[in-house]
Amino acid sequence: MIDDLIVYQKTYDFMLWLHPVVNKFPKSQRFVLGQRIENKTLDLIHSMASANIEREKSALLKQASVELDELRMLIRLSKDLRFVSIKQYGVAAEKLNEIGKLLFSWMKKFS
């Protein structure tokens, strides 16, 4: 079951943490960069859920890895544009690094 996957749970928890942060973006960016960040996080969750049920997991896990890298870049851009604080960026980076380690471990099982 997908809820049993720690990496899925951590990504879901990241989305719960992220939502109020994105809602504080400037109004002009909330529905541009903010929405893109939330959508990318949801894409990552979707890729993990799909990989969990598919027989051929490798391609979906690689897709999840790319989505994670894109998400890291979008969070960094948000920091550089000062939409998130250094502290929020640090929390996000820590959470994304943990997700990345868990995802890499999962990928190693199927490569």
Question: Where do the language-model regions lie?
Answer:
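Amphipathic alpha-helical assembly/interaction segments
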Residues: M1-S111
